[in-house]
Amino acid sequence: VKNQVVNTIAEVINTYYIIVRQKQQLKAIEEQMQINQTRVDLSKRRLEIGMGSRPEYLQSQIDLNAQVSAKLHQETYIRELKAILNQRINPTPAGQDNPLPIDYEVSDTIPIDFEITLDAIRNNLEESSPSLQISRKNLEIAGLSLKEVKADQYPVVQFNSAYNFSLTNNDVALNPFLPLINQNSGFNYGFSAAIPILNYRNTHRLIKQAELNIGYQNILYNSERSALNLRVVNAYNTYELQKEALALEESNILLAKENVTITLETYRLGSTTFIQLREAEKSLEDAYDRLIAARYNAKVAETELLRLKGGLVK
């Protein structure tokens, strides 16, 4: 049950941060719309004073309209993701509306724990991992089954006891030699023993099967432990890689923003071409896409480590 709960919580966390990711994407689109609006104004002014061309102005307006359309699609997508999150939190049968609202707000940041170490994940892993807990429980059940089967080969001793009491009251003496009132009481006890001789072969066969099952469950446990250690190492390597990628993209976004600011100003002064400005804007758009993806991927890697550890449920 805990394994299912942990997996469900991991799915809910990842779905929630998909929404946060798309909200960050929406903010990036809105920022790019402001830059495109500035380009529209500049290209229109350049056209009016004879320094620009109408195709430049038209292309700027087309790019702005494309961003407006992208914003509308992004808002719709976020509402769809909220409905998916509601369904995972509160599953609703087909044909029924989910009672949870979809007009709630989510955070616009993705918090990431940068201090997770491999030793911290490995510490007490065999006790906290839900998958290993299941394997260990199956091994314990197999051991109890063996004890139960072995008990069938031993003699069974039973203690029996009884207390009898009877009272007879005759109003009329049918026989003069019998008393009118007769009372009997007594305590009886005894022992009985059963020796399973004829069932020996069947019991021996069941014991062998139970011993084989213990060996099989032990193999499964060791296999799951080895596989879990491998998954933890791979997940941690991914976590470290995503942290490095995030640091790189956080540095790169600053360069892209500075590049757009400088290019807009030089375009205003007539020292930069229209194509160079569009390339700078495209570089900023790509930088935002990579940064937002890096943040989300780092969070997914962190969640996976905690899922394997069993740290999502206390």
What are the language-model segments listed below?
Residues 16, 122, 158, 190-192, ...:
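Membrane-embedded beta-strand positions in outer-membrane beta-barrel channels/transporters
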Residues 54, 168-172, 202:
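Outer-membrane beta-barrel proteins
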Residues 92-162:
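Amphipathic alpha-helical coiled-coil scaffold segments and their short linker/junction regions
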Residues 7-124, 238, 242, 284:
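Periplasmic alpha-helical coiled-coil/stalk elements that build and connect Gram-negative outer-membrane
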Residues 4, 8-27, 81, 134-149, ...:
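Amphipathic alpha-helical coiled-coil segments
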Residues 103-114, 147, 160-195:
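Small/polar, glycine/serine/threonine/aspartate-rich low-complexity segments that form flexible
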Residues 14, 59, 156, 186-188:
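Transmembrane beta-barrel architecture of outer-membrane proteins
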Residues 63, 152, 162-166, 194-196, ...:
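Outer-membrane beta-barrel pore domains and translocons
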